[in-house]
Structures are given as structure tokens and as C-alpha cells.
Amino acid sequence: MEMSGLGRKRVSKWDSKEDTHHHHSSVNANSASYYRDKESEPVRFNAESNGEARTRSRVSQNNDNSYFSEQDGTRQQFVRRSGSRSNSRSRSRSRSPVYRARRDAGSYDRHKTRTQVSPTPIREFNKRGSDHLFDQSRSDHYGWEDNIRKPRETKYHTDDFREEAMMEGARSSDYNNTDYPEDNSRIRRRRSEFTGEKETQRRDGGDGEGGFHRSSNIPCKFFAAGTGFCRNGKYCRFSHHVADRKQPQDNNNNFYRQDNNNHTSGHNKWNDVERLDNGRVGGIEVSRASKKGVSESKGNGSSSWIDDMEMSPDWNYGVQALKKPVKEDHSVGIIGQSSQSRVLKDDQRSSGMFSHGGRTMAEKPVAASHQSYSNSVNVAPVETFNQNHNALPYQSSLTAGGSQQVLAAAATNFSVGSNLSNLESGKVYQDNHHSTVEKPVLVQNTVSREQIDQITNISASLAQFLANGQPIPQLEQALQLPLHSESVQPNQATTQSNVVSSNPNQLWGLGMSTGAEGVPAVTASKISNVEEIQEVSLDPKENGDKKTDEASKEEEGKKTGEDTNDAENVVDEDEDGDDDGSDEENKKEKDPKGMRAFKFALVEVVKELLKPAWKEGKLNKDGYKNIVKKVAEKVTGTMQSGNVPQTQEKIDHYLSASKPKLTKLVQAYVGKIKKT
């Protein structure tokens, strides 16, 4: 206790002596120096050597007698810093002045230092150089970054610190204080101002840090840098629990804010999406949005029906972002296991809906991702529909009936109860024409086994009809009729519940006609558009109509030989239809280009057929023109407006097939004109 008392007297004496100098109360001690004081205090005294500060570096320097004198400011500052302690530790440790440390230091104390202790703070101070306090006085604010950016402030140094200390002192001071320590009074005065202010603040608790922290509470500067790595490893004296400690206030907004709802930079962060390690329930990995993205939808009667579905592995395709998020209440969806496990391993935010067991979970924020949806309704097995590849903003909901579909407003006009032509064309008929599907898309299909069998039978019957070239009943009527109540209009949401018809020529309740995996070869991939269907299906009928009309007349003429009555009947029929022909001619003038091109090609064929009679002189000019006109009107009159070949290739094919019939018709007209 004697030593402690003597140490306190010395401290008070030095304080009163230094107060005669310029003592600025406005100077605030920085946080970096505060932490260094805290860090260095446990090293300065040794209980085994009667509480006297004995260090290896101090002995070597003092024996040299070239670095510091007894009145050097460096010594004063160190003693002042070592003596500035709280009352709780002053009774247990001595505050003996520096000359005792110099006198008693020896080889015994070199080996009696505390275990696992770094070199002492005087060594650290010499390593930093004499400009250390000047650098601090010139800076405006201090924080963790001051310690981070100065690699010389580490507490573990090499043995060549004496040379570096001399170089640093010579570089940063006005005089070389290692050679002329007594003359450098300005440096001593400035250091004493800082140390006096520091001690006053620490005695009075001016820092707001009332109690003294142990070395274990002092954060390690390497961990404070955010690297998570300390080069001293487990032998480091300082705390590595930096993440649990509150950071300085000036760095709060930079790197410490970990709030789930805080997006400082305006973009999505990964703390919005929490990856559940224990989310592997039944082989399905679950990714949920944090705190507000996950909602459980409790649908009416939404039982565990996902296990009954047949999952296909290759239905994962790109989906654009939906304009509206899917409703949380009563919404049900499916995600295949293969695509889900693939998507959730990406670094993107996955969203959508999935169902496991009896619980259906929906992720509210719908974002664009490489994820496919098959929003199907828990309905009767008759009625299903699949997602279009353009990701149209429709939603599926469970109504009270449990077997109805609702498509949202502004959705495209899906022909749910479409007929054969809509199915084969692979198109979705819409009013706005902004999402036409030209080819089948592999999507998840949810159909029952009965429906697959029915569709298989229907497709087989269709293939037979098309192969045999037989006219399909009700096809012409279906093509000409506009879409009626069976298709959902874009501006109103209607519910529908259709039943599969027993007629194999009609396909009802097939939902979207884009083709699906569960439907085997619905001929959508074979036929590209409606026009080809019309030609394939109706051209045999047209040819048959023309063949029957013309062949009946020609066969009657053959049976009677050159019977003039029959020939006159044919011509009379044409003459009776002259008035109608004039009207038809007016209509033909308004026909589109396709009809005109067909007419011109037909006229050329008729002229070629009339050349022999014209050369033989059997026809005059007027008769020639009349025959050409009547034959053209006769052929085009039998054709329906929607069945006229449009391209030149189709026109040539049609005329070459019907050339024998045209020849007989032209001969009948020539015979009629001869007899007149």
C-alpha cells in the first residue's frame, strides 16, 4: 500500500505540474486511444514482481541511454497512462513512478511476465513513432476505421522495432527527439496536455464508459474490421465476439444494420429470403419469404391431392412476372419436385405456390424466375387447364361448387369448350390477339385416366377421318360460328363446367388447346394454323361437291350420247342463273385477292380448253367469252367463301385435280353453242 500511495502522490504532482501548461479542455480523447489504453493496461503490471512495471524493451532502451532520458515526454505519458486507473483497481496494483521500474528491471523480470502476453505498450509506442499523438490530434473523429487502416498499430511486432521507432521519430517530429530529448519541450508539452485531459476524463467518467473493461471485453481490431480472421488465433487476448457488440454510431448505417425490413440500397437482399435447413419436408425443399412473404391459404376442401398427380420432369420453362400477385385466399398450385429443387438452389428469389400434404402454402411476392407454374383447380377430373407459355395474369380459385373455373379480368380468351378445329390448330382464340400459341408447350397436365383414354380414342378417330379424306360433320359450322358462351370473354369472369361429349367428332372440356404431355398426339403439332385445317378438311368436300354437280351433268350427257335435251338443260340452268350470276359477279368484284387470283387462274385453264374449238372455228368471239365467263362463275359459285385456295401452289394443285371435270363442262357448253 505504500507503493500505491507513493504512486498516487506522484500522479497528482505531475498533474499539477502539467496543468501550468496550456491545458485545453475542449480536446476530446478519441475512441481509438481509449481502446488502446484499455487494451494495454493488463500488461503493464505484474503481480508476481510486487506490482512494478518491468518490461524487456524498457530495460534494453534504458541501458542503451540513447533513446530517452528520465524527463522525456514519452516516459511521462506512459507513466501517466499507466497511472490513470479506476478506483476499483488502484488498491490491487501499484502506481510506482518510472524510476523504480528502471532501477529494478532486470533479467528476473524478463521471464516473469504474464503468460500469453504480447510485448508491452512502450514497445508498441516506439513502434508507432513519436507522431502518433499528433496524428490523432489532427483528425476530426475517430472510430473503428482508424484502427483498421493503420497496420502499425498492431500489438505484435518484430524484434527490429528499435530501428523503426528511431526512423518514425525522426520523420515526424521537428527535432530528432532520440538525439536531443531534453530540447523537445513542445512535444512534451503537447503530449502532457493530451494525457492530462485523458486522465481527467477517465477519473470523472467523462467518456460515458464508467467502469473499467477487462481485456476479454475489448474487441479484437482484426475482427472489428469485418474480416472474421485474427492472425493470433486462439492466443489473442481480446474478444472475438464482435458481432454481438454494438458498433460505433458513425458506422451504424454502413454495415451494421441487419434489419429484415431495411433495404438501404434500394434492392432486394438475401435477408428477405430465409433458407430453411429443416424445410426438407417429404423430399421438398421449402424456401419462404421472411415475415411477410409467406401466407397459408386454407382452401375449402383442399385436401391432400398432390400425391395423386403425375409429375413430369421436363416442364420447367421460363415464366414472366405476373402483373398481379395470386390471391392468398383459396388459391392452390402445384410445383414439380424436380423443378422446385432446381430453382431453390439458385441465388434468385423463388416465388410461387406449392402444396405439401393438406397444407397449401403460397409465396406472396411473385417475381420472375426460372420456375414453372401449373395453376390448376381442385375440380372434377373432367375440367382442367394449363398455364400458357406467356404467363397470362389469370388466377384459379375454388368456388362454392368446387368444380368450376374462374379466369380473371383482362385474361385472354381461352376457348375452354372448343371444338375440333380449335384443338387441332393449337391456337388460343382471343379478342386482343396478344398471346397466340403456335406450337404445343410442355406443361404439367392434371387429367384423369378416363379422360386420357377418351382423348386417345378421339385422336385415333380424327386420324382416321383425316387419312380417309372424309368430310367431318359439323366442322364447317364450327369454323364459321363465332366463339360463344363456351369461351371466357376477356372483360368478364365466367364460370363453366363442361362435360365430355359422347360424340367423337367434338372435343369438350379440354381446357386450353395448347397440347399437353398427358394428351397423346392431339394433332396440334401437325397442323400449324386454321387455314390449313380448313383446306385439308374442306377441300375434299369442295371437290366432291363440284365433282358431283359436274359429273352428274356430264354422265347424263354421256348416257344420252349427244342428246340435245340434256345439253340444253345444262345450258338452261346456266341461263336461268344469269341474273344471279350478275349479282355474283358484283360480289366477286368485292372479293379479296385470294378469290381474284383463283379466278384468273381458272380463266386461263378454261381458255386453254377452248383453244381447239376456237381454232376449228366452232366458236365465235362472243360465244368464246360467254363460255369462259359461265364456267368461271359456275366453279366459283360452288365454292364456299372460306374454302378458296389462297397461294399459287394450292391454286395450281386444285386446278390440276379438277381439270377433267372442267374439260367436260367446257365441252358441254361448246356443244350447246353449236346447236344454237
Curated annotation (Swiss-Prot):
**Biased composition annotated in UniProt, kind: Polar residues:** 58-79
List, in alphabetical order, the Gene Ontology terms for molecular function in this entry.
Answer: DNA binding; zinc ion binding
Q: Does the keyword Lipid metabolism apply?
A: no
Q: Does the keyword Zinc-finger apply?
A: yes
The annotated regions of Basic and acidic residues compositional bias extend over 12-21, 101-110, 124-134, 192-212, 269-278, 538-562, 584-594
Segments of skewed composition (Acidic residues): 563-583
Show the PROSITE patterns listed in the entry. ZF_C3H1
Q: Which domain of life is it from?
A: Eukaryota
Q: Which InterPro entries match?
A: Zinc_finger_CCCH (IPR052650), Znf_CCCH (IPR000571)
Q: Where is the composition biased (Low complexity)?
A: 251-262
> Keywords assigned by UniProt?
DNA-binding, Metal-binding, Zinc, Zinc-finger
Q: Where are the zinc fingers (C3H1-type)?
A: 214-243
Region of interest (Disordered), ranges: 1-134, 172-217, 245-307, 487-506, 533-594
Fetch the PANTHER family from UniProt.
PROTEIN FRIGIDA-ESSENTIAL 1 (PTHR36886), ZINC FINGER CCCH DOMAIN-CONTAINING PROTEIN 38 (PTHR36886:SF8)
- Protein name per its UniProtKB record: Zinc finger CCCH domain-containing protein 38
UniProt source species? Arabidopsis thaliana
